[in-house]
Amino acid sequence: ASFTNMATLSYNGSQINSNVVTGELRDALTITKTAVSGGYRPGDTVTYVVTLSNTCTAALTGLTLTDDLGGYTAGGQTVYPLAYEAGTLHYYTGGTEQTAPAVTAGPPMTVTGVTAPAGGNVTLVYQARVTEFAPPGVEGEIRNTVTVSGGGLATPLTATATTAARLEPELTISKALSPAVVTGNGPLTY
């Protein structure tokens, strides 16, 4: 967003206006979310990377990150196509892993006590398991939104990662031999 400003000078009944200056307002905190996955099937695990970048000269503390785990309404109730995998949160400040803040698995998943350092970034990496509520098929996708709030932010910030359903079949093959021990020229069954 941009803004403009002009000054007015008044003296002895005269008035003069200055030139108009234009500036740009940038968000002090930005958020991105990425799904590290080529698609999903029920039971798969999807890794998410959330990065908060702080351009302020002061750290932003007391932030809360809320992941909606892709929740949507079906049949009058909210269902969740993702479930946070406990113990998978990794928390990096400036690229160095730190002790992870408190996590509530939810749904929704909530991480409290997040700090975005002055002029730096914080990255959270975690995994979620795909549940039976994940939409299958050609049009199937999970829209997973994360919101950051608190820490003096005027309004919450959001970022969304979309992951599509994998359509290729999951094939397996196995072969067995009977009997396991065969004498010379004896019969085998596969």
Question: For each predicted feature, which ranges?
Answer:
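Exported/extracytosolic protein signature
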Residues: 1-190
